[in-house]
């Protein structure tokens, strides 16, 4: 039995996959972890350097391989895995797809809770705090470079 979990980022796919796999028992696989192992870097780094198209190509290949590798797994897909029709088709044909649907309010609350937990930790270790509200990439880079120039060398 293959079970494939889909849903928005933050809806709990990875956590639920591990819990379901323990109960059945099946193997739990996190597609994003498989992708990062294959790439040798974070998804964000790869995405930034190579673009969304290249990332989606890798994601498509991983989904194809993982969904045929074992007849007994629970797969947590990445939040954007369903963007390609071939991924939706393969998931539907190769197992039972479960959509973990979380409301925008639930997702926002989870993100807010995570923010509340981590913001003090980020601040504790930061030399500078740069507010990203309303700023595009070039503006953020400019702000960072200005801050570094004003501050001079920062001790390691």
Where in the sequence are the language-model features?
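Conserved lysine of the Walker
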Residues: 13
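ATP-dependent small-molecule kinase phosphotransfer cores
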Residues: 30-92, 121
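P-loop (Walker A) phosphate-binding loop of NTP-binding proteins
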Residues: 8
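Short glycine-rich anion-binding loops that position phosphate/pyrophosphate groups of nucleotides
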Residues: 79-81, 103-105, 135
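Hydrophobic positions on the alpha1 helix immediately C-terminal to the Walker A/P-loop
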Residues: 16
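Hydrophobic anchor at the beta1->P-loop junction of P-loop NTPases
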Residues: 5
């Amino acid at each position: 039995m293959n079970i494939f979990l889909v849903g928005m980022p933050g809806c709990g796919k990875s956590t639920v996959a591990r819990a379901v796999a323990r109960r059945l028992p099946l193997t739990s696989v996190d597609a994003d972890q498989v992708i990062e192992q294959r790439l040798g870097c974070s998804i964000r780094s790869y995405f930034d350097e190579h673009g969304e198209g290249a990332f989606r190509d890798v994601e498509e290949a991983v989904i194809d391989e993982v969904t045929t590798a074992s007849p007994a797994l629970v797969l947590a897909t990445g939040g954007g895995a369903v963007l390609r029709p071939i991924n939706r088709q393969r998931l539907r044909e190769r197992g039972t797809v479960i959509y973990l649907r979380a409301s925008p309010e639930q997702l926002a609350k989870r993100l807010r809770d995570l923010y509340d937990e981590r913001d003090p930790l980020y601040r504790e270790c930061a030399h500078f705090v740069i507010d990203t509200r309303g700023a595009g990439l070039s503006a953020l880079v400019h702000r960072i470079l200005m801050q570094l120039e004003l501050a001079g060398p920062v001790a390691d």
